[in-house]
Amino acid sequence: LASKLVPPRPAPRLYLATPPVDEPAQLAAELAGLLAAADVAAVLVRLRETDPRGMISYVKALAPAIQTAGAALLIDGQPDIVARAGADGAHLTGVAAMEDAMPALKPDRIVGAGGLATRHDSMAAGEAGADYVLFGEPDAKGQRPSTEAIAERLEWWDELFEPPCVGFATSREEAEAFAAAGADFVLVGDFIWSDPRGAKAALVEIGEAIAQAHAGTFGKAKVEGKAEG
């Protein structure tokens, strides 16, 4: 019997959504500190709808703080400005919007998909080339599935499909549940920025919490063996 020790899968990383951008210089300074303190894989920049030139200037003001920290900069929607703004990709809501954005973004930039209400939608997004799928964000009416339903969807996707899955967490408890369910990334946003202790303390705590929750489920190395001959 030949056996090998398979290392535990890596813990999910943080995906940080910004507040709607009003003061990019102030936000850039804050982001620099946040990204130095916590392991953030990507930042989702949420822009207030304005003219393209204005939105591009906002993204360019934020880009150095994000990209020099080694994080990817994705824009929430607005695929047409991604290349000109120097962003790394875009997050699109719905399969149709994602497919429409593909020509402007592929093959050089990241295309994320959310707004996937059904398993069929999720599979369609994956087949259409999504670089990740997001589960759990609020719909247009502000409603979202239960924590248990989101965790179940993450677990289902993780077991069957290759593209990374992201869990949209609105609390520490959700972040922990999604890490334990097999999320590759945990998206956090408003509850980080509104934390009375400050965003940095909140983000560091969430990073530690998802690492611990992940370790509790996936943290032990496994021995795989097969009979020879």
Region spans (language model):
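Ligand-binding grooves and catalytic loops that recognize ribose/phosphate and carbohydrate rings
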Residues: 117, 124-128, 132-135, 148-157
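Extended, folded domain segments that form the structural surfaces/walls around functional sites
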Residues: 53, 135, 151-155, 175-180, ...
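Alpha-helical protein-protein interaction elements
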Residues: 7-9, 149, 185
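Generic structural marker for isolated residues within well-ordered, non-membrane alpha-helices
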Residues: 31, 98, 154
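Conserved N-terminal beta1-alpha1 strand-loop-helix module at the mouth
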Residues: 1-91, 106-131, 162-165, 170-176, ...
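Glycine-rich phosphate-binding active-site loops on the catalytic face of alpha/beta enzymes
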Residues: 94-101, 134-145, 181-206
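CoA-thioester-processing core
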Residues: 101, 141-143, 147-160
